[in-house]
Regions:
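Catalytic phosphate-handling regions of large nucleic-acid enzymes and associated NTPases
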Residues: 1-206, 266
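C-terminal interaction appendages of subunits in large macromolecular complexes
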Residues: 3-4, 153-156, 160-638
Length: 638
């Protein structure tokens, strides 16, 4: 058992680590999951400017991906529908309707100009062997964009999940400029479906947002949905509307879906229902309003971390500075190499060093003559000469030597020198250089992705307030049943599913219940009505206690525990204590009492004014009308 436990612990840890690191959670550096990175790298290697069959791209990616083609296909379609890095041709499905993409053999794709310009740089990319060792794949792409926040990846791993909401490219880049300038930033999500968003609880990517469909009235009887909430399709929205209609939460006449590249759902309402009351009901009971939580989890170094939007932007901005610096230094080193060789080439031709090899007998002698001949002009070198430089000089063809143009060569060197000085200047002002690069991307590509989601503040739609009071309740005194499926003649009321009903029975007991379909009420019902917990329901109560002494009180029933029985008679009813009068009249009038006969009794009856009573608690005894036992109680209307 111990060996099995150790085996399970080790294998589970390896499996969990693999799912987290190699499948479900994106890397903060390039914002990509491994399968996405392999797809983009494959497209980069295949890139010739033309479209490629998706089936072919999947096949090439399979050389790097240790899993099935379905995962590659699904990931490619998702990437393509983000529209940042993959240009589509053919039916890639519809994010608005939820329709799937066509088969891979029928659709084509290629890298977008944005991807070519910002994601790849082979000399600065770290590679690792693929799963079978036959090929190499990038450890991460040298992306210069905040891809993690742009795309909004989702993933479920062992013991954790990530759900990053997508943000607007231009706003992210502008936020990076603000960070470089030492300003505070606040970036909010932006969704391709558009819609309305209340970001009050976003909490920098650690909270949630509420999103709504954009619904506008068209006349008194029609509403049109023109934008969807994030994660909702036209099919799921229509299904939720139909479901709410079946439950009686909203009345719908007809629904017409005219969605193509833009959303257009026309909702028609029946007689008696108007747009002004129906739109809040749509937000309350359907997917026209949803809440979306955000949890940004990404691989940082060798482990997953939960981050905020500001933390991610800060990391990626620092990374961008380093990438710009690395690119400039690599470009500078390439120019210095070119300047060095052009200088050697000029000396080799202009000073006729090549003439020294005419008498050399062996390869060793040739190399020695070139080495010695070149070092005679060592003071003109851009940097020390190495043996590889000799090989390059010896590869210069005679035709090139004979056509050597000193003036052109001099201009080429001057241009290289100018470019190196420009790079040195950019490196000296790395922050300004980075800001300039970001501004260039915004100018070139920002217009392609304008903000689609409008930010606003929602007033929470209270389902109780917009619920339709279309449940008809009634009481059948012959059977004692009460509810919506009872055909009775007493206490007919119309309520909503969120209302509560107060029922008082002849024994002085009362209960507050939800609208039932059919329930048996023990005892004869004296009162039944919709109950408002804020206002309450007031009664004037007259009862006799166990000693048959009459008491009266005025009460207001407000607080309650649903379905719990309460008594208007302190101590509860018994064989002798009983409820005599229950009235809701604000001026209940007077009560006439007849006393039980007794020896030497002079007063046999009395009348008492109930209008003088003050409101007391439900459990209070009330006011004693007389200390004498009572034989009968009768209400006299004043």
């Amino acid at each position: 058992m111990t060996q099995l436990e150790q085996l399970m612990r080790r294998n589970f840890l390896e499996y969990a680590s693999y799912v987290v690191m190699d499948r479900a959670i994106p890397d903060i550096r390039d914002g990509l999951k491994p399968v996405q990175r392999r797809i983009l790298n494959t497209l980069f290697e295949m890139d010739d400017g033309r479209f490629h069959k998706v089936a072919n791209v999947i096949g090439e990616t399979m050389k790097l991906h240790p899993h099935g083609d379905a995962a590659i296909r699904d990931a490619l379609v998702v990437l393509a529908n983000k529209r940042y890095f993959i240009e589509r041709q053919g039916n890639f499905g519809n994010l608005l309707t939820g329709h799937p993409a066509a088969a891979p053999r029928y659709i084509e794709c290629r890298l977008t100009p944005l991807a070519r310009e910002t994601l790849f740089n082979v000399p600065l990319t770290e590679y690792a062997p693929s799963y079978d060792g036959r090929k190499k794949e990038p450890v991460s792409l040298p992306s210069k964009l905040p891809v993690l926040l742009m795309q909004g990846p989702e993933g479920i791993a062992v013991g954790m999940a990530t759900k990053t909401l997508p943000h607007n490219l231009t706003e992210l880049l502008q936020a990076q400029i603000d960070l470089l300038n030492g300003k505070e930033v606040r970036v909010l999500p932006d969704f391709p479906q558009g819609g309305l968003m209340d970001p009050a609880e976003y909490d920098d990517g650690r909270g949630k947002i509420r999103v709504r469909a954009k619904i506008e009235p068209r006349g008194d009887k029609t509403a049109v949905v023109s934008e969807l909430p994030y994660g909702v399709t036209t099919e799921s929205l229509i299904a939720s509307i139909e479901n709410a209609s079946q439950k009686g939460q909203i009345k719908i006449g007809e629904i017409h879906d005219y969605t193509t590249d833009t959303v257009e759902i026309e909702i028609q309402f029946p007689r008696g229902t108007y747009v002004e009351e129906a739109i809040p009901q749509l937000y309350a009971y359907t997917d026209a309003e949803v809440s979306v939580s955000s949890s940004i989890v990404a691989i940082c170094g060798d482990r997953p971390e939960q981050l905020s939007v500001t933390q991610v932007l800060g990391f990626l901005t620092d990374q961008l500075l380093e990438q710009i610096r690395a690119e400039l230094e690599w470009e500078k080193s390439q120019l210095e190499d070119k300047r060095h060789f052009l200088t050697l080439e000029r000396i080799f031709v202009e000073e006729r060093v090549y003439k020294r090899i005419e008498e050399a007998k062996t390869d060793k002698d040739v190399r020695a003559e070139v080495w010695d001949g070149m070092h005679a002009y060592e003071d003109r070198f851009a940097r020390p000469m190495i043996k590889d430089d000799i090989d390059r000089l010896l590869q210069i063809k005679i035709r090139r030597i004979s056509r050597f143009d000193i003036e052109k060569h001099k201009k080429d060197l001057e241009e290289i020198h100018r470019q190196i000085e420009e790079i040195v200047r950019k490196l000296a002002d790395l922050k300004g250089t980075t800001i300039g690069w970001i501004e260039g991307v915004i100018e070139k590509f920002g217009g392609e992705w304008p903000r689609r989601t409008s930010m606003t503040s929602f007033t929470t739609v209270d389902k109780k307030e917009v619920a339709r009071a279309d449940i008809r309740l009634s009481y059948d005194p012959e059977t004692g049943f009460y509810g919506s499926k009872v055909r009775g003649s007493r206490f007919e009321i119309e309520v909503s599913p969120y209302d509560k009903v107060l029922i008082v029975t002849q024994d002085g007991m009362y209960r507050i219940i939800a609208p039932p379909e059919k329930t048996l009420i023990p005892g004869k019902v004296l009162f039944c009505a919709k109950h408002d917990a804020e206002e309450g329901i007031g009664f004037t109560v007259v009862y006799r206690d166990a000693d048959r002494v009459a008491w009266a009180k005025r009460v207001v029933i407000k607080t309650f525990i649903k379905d719990k029985e309460y008594s208007l008679i302190p101590g509860g009813p018994d064989d002798r204590a009983r409820l005599e009068i229950l009235t809701r009249r604000p001026d209940p009038g007077k009560v006439h009492l007849k006393f039980l006969p007794a020896k030497r009794q002079r007063v046999k009856e009395g009348t008492f004014d109930l209008n003088d009573l003050i409101v007391k608690g439900v459990t209070s005894r009330g006011n004693r009308l007389s200390p004498k036992p009572v034989s009968s109680v009768k209400l006299i209307r004043g």
